Amino acid sequence: MIKNIKKFDKNIRPNSIRKKTGARISAVQILYLSDICAVDIKTALNVFSENYESVILSELNLKKLEIDLLHRITNGVIKYRKPIDFQISKNLSDNWKINRLSINELNILRLSLYEMFVDKIFDKKTIINEYVSIFDVFSGNIDFANGFLDMISKKKIIL
């Protein structure tokens, strides 16, 4: 499910940043569980907490995740899913269609658009860097992710 998670090692990123990264990686997994198992987000959160959270904590050498961020972005993506998906579809190049994206790639884009255009707590450059790194962890095409997120970050989008 996750390949290069060790890149977020404690020697590279401080604990406070790894907690946020862990929350974002966890959000990708929770949204994946919700999509694949066709369950609501609360059920997916519970399944994740019981079965997968300890793996993320161990891999990132953390005691806990940034839970407020995790809940805010997962619930936010669920709430804004349709307008976010519309913006993703609208802004993909002609040779890319939304159904060409893997579930994780799509959810990473959803999370990044939610954080850039709704949540607005972190600056867009930080969000782009974080989600491009997460794209890499989930075997995504980082050139695509970087190009798409950079392009869309320059637009005035209201969700």
What do these predicted ranges mean?
Residues 1-159:
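N-terminal interaction/assembly modules
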